[in-house]
Amino acid sequence: MKILVTGSAGRVGSFVARQLLGEGHRVRGFDLKPSGINSPEFDEVVGDFDDAAAAQRASNGVDAVLHLGAFMSWLPADRDRLYRANVDGTRIVLEAAAAAKVGRFVFASSGEVYPENKPEFQPVTEDHPARPLSPYGVTKLLGEELVKFQGRVSPMETVILRFSHTQNASELLDPTSFFSGPRFFLHPKIRQQEGFGNALAVEKLKALDIGEEALVLTRNENGRPFRMHITDTRDMAKGILLALTHAKAVGGIFNLGATEPVDFADILPAMAKKTGLPLVAVDLPGAGVWYHTSNARIRETLGFEPEWPITRMLDEAVSAWTRRQT
């Protein structure tokens, strides 16, 4: 097959593109910047998803589309860009794919459509009401509706995957990581909360600053440690490829992520023990993050089996962290 991978310069898209090439497929990338992938079986279109001409060039001659690219932000200043990339862009890529008579279109949505961090019940299944509370979540839900519409009015097969939070294992202990830095490390978390304008959180965090980098165990205002899903990129790629090829995926909506959530009360002490970094704990205002999302449907329907639980990811993260210290 020849497969279009949007977001081919990103974490998941670049990994999936390389994996497809390794399996003997031809791949076309489509992203705002070059992917850096070098293969005779790879070509790419550099441009915006909402550029109809670029989307058509990207879609022509491919058998399937993995629409993994998106713009992610929670900043009010980015809302116009969010809607252009994630709603207009998805519509335009869908229409280009349908015009090119693409066989299957796989769309990367998000747990933000529920949203996972404020669930009405747990574990969160695909039947949970979709009532997003962030502009990003709204754009992904609108994208889902566009995909379902195209599936109704054209012969193109469609699949929707609601992504878990995704990371490379090597990022877990990297304080410069966009996600893991402020999630697990004190100084990046202080900078994040300053950017959000959360003065009370900043005050509490700065009171813990010992002058050197430390890990931080975040709890809610009642002392409950955070809990969330963190899924390895390799497991996400495995689920994406099942959505691309499995007959039972057609027309489906699937949560894609790790089977078990990560309890910060367990993982942070383990990180501290394996690295020797100091560990501090903080209770921040609000209910905090505490959720469990079910992946039962994709396991039972498509045979998805994650292979990289957080403990295995952490072992790899420690190796990467050790290399950075030398």
Briefly describe each language-model feature range.
Residues 3-23:
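N-terminal Rossmann NAD(P)H-binding glycine-rich loop of SDR-like oxidoreductase domains
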Residues 310-326:
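Amphipathic terminal alpha-helices
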Residues 65, 77-105:
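NAD(P)-cofactor binding segment of oxidoreductase domains
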Residues 36, 47-85:
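NAD(P)H-binding glycine-rich loop region in Rossmannoid oxidoreductase-like domains
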Residues 92-135:
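Conserved Rossmann-fold NAD(P)-dependent oxidoreductase catalytic core, especially the SDR/UDP-sugar
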Residues 227, 235-285:
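Mid/C-terminal beta-alpha module of Rossmann-like enzyme folds, strongest
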Residues 84, 119-160, 181-184:
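Catalytic helix-loop patch of NAD(P)-dependent Rossmann-fold dehydrogenases
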Residues 149-228, 233-235:
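NAD(P)-dependent short-chain dehydrogenase/reductase
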